[in-house]
Regions:
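Globular "head" domains of long coiled-coil molecular machines
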Residues: 1-267
Length: 268
């Protein structure tokens, strides 16, 4: 299960883990639905969606727009995940609504109920690294601490724009570790990730068409994440097998932290 406040990049992280655009990323597109995203064992080129009606070959338009006739809180999507390693087990990511939506206070109720009542192997709590330690985060973290008893991984996204010499990924991790301890989390596991870099890298690796802006951002991220501090895999203490290619896409995937994160998730 993945939870976060809005603007943390939760949908982008899910798109990066799946390696396809299956979730909306605009804040104003959020709906009060729980998305169950299932890994298929084979790549057959189809994405299915069950949202009141079953679509065996859901188009991007169908995936990006919820069916108004669905009077439940659940939407199910199935596709083959594009991962660095072969996934030989059943995997389902449960995507919950952002809890601090100003448009719909019901989002918090749905997410809180999910955290309390849905059984899962792991909870991922995602922070917005550009706006960390907010009152909204503290409120939601307190709820998670009091109502979820399972394993938690904390991720800090959006630290790519930190200024060298002014901001520090390492310092942010250390500070948030201490803050989580103060809230009652014992020995919290906390890691950085660049969800957007990982998403763009996977799309490029699988020859998906990028917009002109995305192509420019991909090039910029390849350069930026080569810097030692922004090579996020070092913070996971995982050994990543190298798969070099000429355009540096594989290295960007490693530097983004997504490969080390996938190792953590799929070892459970």
């Amino acid at each position: 299960m993945i939870t976060a406040n809005m603007s943390a990049g939760k949908s982008t992280l899910l798109n990066a883990l799946v390696g396809k655009k299956i979730n909306k990323t605009l804040n104003d597109s959020c709906t009060a639905k729980i998305h169950y995203i299932h890994n298929k064992f084979i790549e057959d080129g189809y994405i299915y969606e069950y949202d009141h009606e079953l679509e065996l070959n859901a188009s991007n338009e169908i995936l990006m727009n919820d069916n108004e006739e669905n009077d439940t809180t659940d939407i199910h999507v199935g596709t083959k995940f594009r991962s660095w390693q072969e996934i030989d087990k059943r995997v389902c990511f449960i995507d919950t609504p952002g809890v601090n939506s100003s448009m719909d206070k019901g989002h918090r109720e749905i997410t809180d109920d999910s955290i309390t009542n849905i059984e899962c192997d792991l909870l991922i709590y995602l922070f917005n690294g550009e706006n960390i330690g907010t009152d909204d985060d503290i409120r939601h973290l307190s709820y998670v601490h009091d109502h979820y008893m399972g394993k938690i991984i904390f991720l800090i996204n959006r630290v790519d724009n930190y200024k060298t010499g002014t901001d520090s990924v390492k310092d942010t991790l250390e500070k948030e570790y201490k803050d989580l301890q103060k809230l009652g989390f014992k020995n919290p596991e906390i890691y950085p990730v660049s969800a957007y870099a990982a998403y763009l890298a996977k799309m490029a690796l699988h020859k998906e068409k990028l917009s002109e802006d995305e192509a420019e951002e991909l090039s910029a991220l390849k350069r930026r994440l080569k810097r030692p501090e922004f090579s996020y895999e070092q913070y996971y203490k995982k050994t990543i097998p190298r798969k070099e290619n000429e355009d540096g896409i594989s290295q960007l995937l490693i530097n983004s932290g997504i490969i080390a994160l996938e190792q953590l998730l799929y070892e459970l």
